[in-house]
Amino acid sequence: MGFQKIDYATWPRRPYFEHYHRDVPCWYSMTVDVDITALLPRLRGSGLRFYPSVIHGISRMVNADPALRMAMDETGAIGVYDRVDPTYTIFHKDDETFSVLWTAYQPDLRAFCQDWEADRARYGDIHTFEARPPEAGQGLFNISAVPWASFRSLHLELPEANDYLLPIFTLGRYRKENGRTLLPLAMQVHHGVTDGFHVGRFFNRLQAWADSAPEMGA
């Protein structure tokens, strides 16, 4: 998995990064209700599961934007991953804990969901935090799910994570409202590399995908 270092001296975003990383360290979050009214019947007709399909949709939009693939390597250099893969949580009902797995991102939805099913079968019953540890040099971003609550806002406190630049997502329980089905999705980003413009573009792209999702069929 490639990691392309930026030329920090000529990077147009350098003053913004230095302000929000060094002078005023700043993470911020935004929670948006994604309208999945059209998505759900398409999923039912396709035979695909909801959770891996939404993980794929989020991953597609993250990989579409270099600003959402930015990270710092072990030397502190800033760069952009050629591809980032999603980690996601699997809940264990027996002891009420969870494990973190990952599945390699690929553009094809059905192929991704097949890989997700295989990873879930292989690692999903391992009761430890990282049931599938990351590979060396791998770019990973986080998705978690809280299917027991439909929240309006969610923010994570990350006091020691100022060098972590990749986005973090949390899914809530979807709900019916005024005839629509809405999925709360919280997105937390580092302001050093991600502005409101990038967050807005992500959600607009994700909504367009949820409205059409042509790869699922009619």
Regions found by a protein language model. Name each.
Residues G2-I6, H21-S53, L68-P86, S99, ...:
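Gly/Ser/Thr-rich phosphate-binding loops and adjoining beta-strand/alpha-helix segments
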Residues T10-R14, R60-M61, D65-R83, T87-V100, ...:
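Catalytic/RNA-binding core of pseudouridine synthases
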Residues L39-A64, L183-F202:
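Acyl activation and transfer enzymes in specialized metabolism, enriched
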Residues H92-A149:
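Helical lid/core segments from catalytic subdomains that handle acyl or acyl-like groups
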Residues D119-A131, E135, L165, F169, ...:
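Plant-skewed but cross-kingdom recognition/interaction modules and surfaces
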Residues R152:
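Active-site cores that bind ATP or allylic diphosphates and position pyrophosphate for catalysis
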Residues E157-Q188, G192, N204:
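Intrinsically disordered, low-complexity linker/assembly segments
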Residues A208-A218:
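Flexible helix-coil linker/hinge segments at domain or subdomain boundaries
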